[in-house]
Amino acid sequence: MVQSKEVNRDQNREKVAAPLRVSRSLYTPEQRIKRDKSAWTWIQGILAPIQFLVFLISLVLVLRFLATGEGQNIAIWSIVIKTATLYTIMVTGCIWEKVVFDCYLFAPAFFWEDVFSMLVLALHTAYLLALATDALSIEQLMYLALAAYATYVVNAAQFIRKLRIARLDHATQQAAMKQATTSGMEVPA
């Protein structure tokens, strides 16, 4: 009797957990076509590594200033340039999302990445506002920039992870289609 209850409990757990294991593709076939045909996909692919390079240079300049007190102006301006690249990639990313998913932000496929992007934008914007109004000391500005940069790194990792999952999912789908066609099974359109 005890063993029977345990088996039933395990079966119920499997039924509850089953929907959690179902993998949904990041893109529908139509969205994948839109993504592949859009010039905005290429633009995002160019801007992302540029922004990362600007981030790395700025990070070094900010850390150098905090460690030595040298290079204050270049550190300040590097953060402004990093923020401008962030705004640029956010605007072009919104356009890309509109083209592929038919909404400018918070498409289900990238909902949490977009939510976290809002924090990244808020911290970078807070830096610009504090810089313009002298609301913070130079050291406080640099630490605010580092907080903004930390959120940027997390957000970039979110996007990289999501795109890697999409690439692996697509490869799995392609392999399954190839397997189905070579075994003579009919592949749905």
Place the predicted regions along the sequence by residue.
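Long, non-globular segments of proteins
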Residues: M1-Q3, V7, T182-A189
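Cytosolic juxtamembrane amphipathic/interface segments immediately preceding
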Residues: T28-T41
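Charge-rich, acidic-biased intrinsically disordered regions
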Residues: A67-N73, Q174, A180
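Hydrophobic cores of alpha-helical transmembrane segments in multi-pass integral membrane proteins
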Residues: V2-Q3, N12-V22, I43-L66, Q72-V100, ...
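Short, highly charged, low-complexity non-transmembrane loops/tails of multi-pass membrane proteins
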Residues: A166-P188
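Short alpha-helical hairpin
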Residues: L20-E30
